[in-house]
Regions:
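Small cysteine-rich, disulfide-bonded extracellular modules of the LU/uPAR three-finger superfamily
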Residues: 1-150, 155-160
Length: 160
Protein backbone atom coordinates (compact mmCIF):
# COMPACT_ATOMS: atom_id res chain seq x y z
CA UNK A 1 0.00 0.00 0.00
CA UNK A 2 1.53 3.31 -0.98
CA UNK A 3 2.05 6.20 1.45
CA UNK A 4 -0.60 8.41 -0.17
CA UNK A 5 -3.32 5.76 0.21
CA UNK A 6 -2.22 5.20 3.81
CA UNK A 7 -2.64 8.91 4.58
CA UNK A 8 -6.07 9.23 2.95
CA UNK A 9 -7.41 6.08 4.65
CA UNK A 10 -6.20 7.38 8.01
CA UNK A 11 -7.80 10.77 7.35
CA UNK A 12 -11.07 9.17 6.24
CA UNK A 13 -11.15 6.94 9.34
CA UNK A 14 -10.57 9.86 11.69
CA UNK A 15 -13.25 11.90 9.89
CA UNK A 16 -15.66 8.94 9.85
CA UNK A 17 -15.75 8.88 6.05
CA UNK A 18 -16.58 5.19 5.83
CA UNK A 19 -19.66 2.99 5.75
CA UNK A 20 -20.41 0.11 8.08
CA UNK A 21 -21.90 -2.71 6.02
CA UNK A 22 -22.82 -6.34 6.66
CA UNK A 23 -19.49 -7.29 5.04
CA UNK A 24 -17.30 -4.90 7.06
CA UNK A 25 -16.08 -1.32 7.02
CA UNK A 26 -16.04 0.15 3.51
CA UNK A 27 -14.11 3.23 2.38
CA UNK A 28 -16.20 4.22 -0.67
CA UNK A 29 -13.77 6.81 -2.06
CA UNK A 30 -11.09 4.16 -2.39
CA UNK A 31 -12.97 0.87 -2.82
CA UNK A 32 -11.27 -0.50 0.31
CA UNK A 33 -13.02 -2.98 2.66
CA UNK A 34 -11.86 -3.97 6.17
CA UNK A 35 -13.61 -6.98 7.69
CA UNK A 36 -13.14 -10.11 9.70
CA UNK A 37 -14.74 -13.01 11.50
CA UNK A 38 -13.95 -15.18 14.45
CA UNK A 39 -14.25 -18.91 14.92
CA UNK A 40 -15.17 -20.67 18.12
CA UNK A 41 -15.93 -24.21 19.21
CA UNK A 42 -17.02 -25.84 22.46
CA UNK A 43 -15.15 -28.91 23.73
CA UNK A 44 -13.57 -29.54 20.33
CA UNK A 45 -16.97 -29.68 18.64
CA UNK A 46 -18.15 -28.17 15.39
CA UNK A 47 -16.61 -24.79 14.56
CA UNK A 48 -18.90 -21.78 14.16
CA UNK A 49 -17.96 -18.54 12.42
CA UNK A 50 -19.29 -15.10 13.33
CA UNK A 51 -18.70 -11.77 11.59
CA UNK A 52 -16.75 -9.22 13.61
CA UNK A 53 -17.88 -5.71 14.38
CA UNK A 54 -14.90 -3.39 14.29
CA UNK A 55 -15.64 -0.36 16.52
CA UNK A 56 -14.29 3.06 15.54
CA UNK A 57 -11.55 2.99 18.22
CA UNK A 58 -10.37 -0.42 16.98
CA UNK A 59 -10.33 0.70 13.35
CA UNK A 60 -8.24 3.75 14.22
CA UNK A 61 -5.87 1.50 16.22
CA UNK A 62 -5.47 -0.93 13.29
CA UNK A 63 -4.78 1.90 10.87
CA UNK A 64 -2.30 3.59 13.24
CA UNK A 65 -0.37 0.35 13.79
CA UNK A 66 -0.57 -1.09 10.26
CA UNK A 67 -0.01 2.02 8.18
CA UNK A 68 0.61 4.81 10.66
CA UNK A 69 3.54 5.29 13.01
CA UNK A 70 2.11 3.78 16.22
CA UNK A 71 4.08 0.88 17.72
CA UNK A 72 2.44 -2.53 17.84
CA UNK A 73 1.22 -3.43 21.35
CA UNK A 74 3.01 -6.19 23.26
CA UNK A 75 0.03 -8.54 22.96
CA UNK A 76 -3.62 -9.05 22.14
CA UNK A 77 -6.07 -10.73 24.50
CA UNK A 78 -9.57 -12.19 24.32
CA UNK A 79 -12.28 -10.93 26.64
CA UNK A 80 -15.48 -12.94 27.00
CA UNK A 81 -18.68 -11.05 27.74
CA UNK A 82 -22.31 -11.85 28.49
CA UNK A 83 -24.14 -8.53 28.34
CA UNK A 84 -27.48 -8.16 26.60
CA UNK A 85 -26.31 -5.07 24.69
CA UNK A 86 -25.27 -5.68 21.09
CA UNK A 87 -21.71 -4.58 20.27
CA UNK A 88 -21.64 -1.05 18.87
CA UNK A 89 -19.30 1.28 17.01
CA UNK A 90 -18.89 3.52 20.08
CA UNK A 91 -17.44 0.78 22.31
CA UNK A 92 -13.95 1.67 23.55
CA UNK A 93 -11.33 0.10 25.78
CA UNK A 94 -12.45 2.48 28.55
CA UNK A 95 -16.13 1.48 28.45
CA UNK A 96 -15.85 -2.14 27.29
CA UNK A 97 -15.98 -4.06 30.60
CA UNK A 98 -19.06 -2.23 31.93
CA UNK A 99 -20.90 -1.88 28.60
CA UNK A 100 -20.31 -5.43 27.39
CA UNK A 101 -20.72 -7.13 30.75
CA UNK A 102 -17.27 -8.71 30.71
CA UNK A 103 -17.20 -12.07 32.48
CA UNK A 104 -14.81 -11.58 35.40
CA UNK A 105 -15.84 -14.26 37.91
CA UNK A 106 -13.39 -17.14 38.39
CA UNK A 107 -16.14 -19.35 39.84
CA UNK A 108 -19.09 -18.43 37.59
CA UNK A 109 -17.18 -17.71 34.40
CA UNK A 110 -13.77 -18.92 33.28
CA UNK A 111 -10.82 -19.90 35.43
CA UNK A 112 -8.01 -17.96 33.75
CA UNK A 113 -6.65 -15.27 36.10
CA UNK A 114 -6.13 -12.98 33.10
CA UNK A 115 -7.61 -12.72 29.62
CA UNK A 116 -6.23 -15.47 27.34
CA UNK A 117 -3.64 -14.27 24.84
CA UNK A 118 -4.42 -14.24 21.12
CA UNK A 119 -1.22 -15.29 19.32
CA UNK A 120 -1.72 -15.09 15.56
CA UNK A 121 0.51 -16.48 12.84
CA UNK A 122 1.66 -14.04 10.20
CA UNK A 123 -0.19 -14.18 6.91
CA UNK A 124 1.89 -15.58 4.07
CA UNK A 125 -0.19 -16.13 0.97
CA UNK A 126 -3.65 -15.66 2.49
CA UNK A 127 -5.65 -12.48 3.10
CA UNK A 128 -6.22 -13.23 6.77
CA UNK A 129 -4.45 -14.19 9.97
CA UNK A 130 -5.42 -16.86 12.47
CA UNK A 131 -4.23 -18.35 15.73
CA UNK A 132 -4.58 -22.04 14.80
CA UNK A 133 -0.90 -22.58 15.69
CA UNK A 134 -1.55 -21.37 19.24
CA UNK A 135 -5.27 -21.65 19.93
CA UNK A 136 -6.59 -19.63 22.87
CA UNK A 137 -8.84 -21.54 25.24
CA UNK A 138 -10.66 -21.05 28.52
CA UNK A 139 -11.96 -23.46 31.14
CA UNK A 140 -15.50 -22.63 32.21
CA UNK A 141 -16.35 -22.95 35.91
CA UNK A 142 -19.97 -22.76 37.02
CA UNK A 143 -22.49 -24.37 39.32
CA UNK A 144 -25.26 -23.80 36.79
CA UNK A 145 -24.68 -22.10 33.43
CA UNK A 146 -22.60 -19.34 31.84
CA UNK A 147 -23.88 -17.55 28.75
CA UNK A 148 -21.22 -16.02 26.50
CA UNK A 149 -22.70 -13.48 24.09
CA UNK A 150 -19.43 -12.37 22.53
CA UNK A 151 -15.66 -12.07 22.55
CA UNK A 152 -13.56 -8.92 22.17
CA UNK A 153 -9.93 -8.56 21.12
CA UNK A 154 -8.15 -6.11 23.45
CA UNK A 155 -4.56 -5.03 24.16
CA UNK A 156 -4.71 -5.40 27.96
CA UNK A 157 -4.68 -8.79 29.67
CA UNK A 158 -6.40 -7.64 32.89
CA UNK A 159 -10.02 -8.74 33.26
CA UNK A 160 -12.64 -6.10 34.04
Amino acid sequence: MDAKLQRVLMKDALNENFDETEEGIFFPKHGFMLSGEYMDRVNGGEATFTKNLIPKEALIHVLNVAIGSKAKPAGSYLALFNGATAPADNWTAANFAATAGEIVSLTEGYTNATRPQFIPSDSTDQKYIDNFGSVASVTIATTSQVNVTGVALLTNNQRG
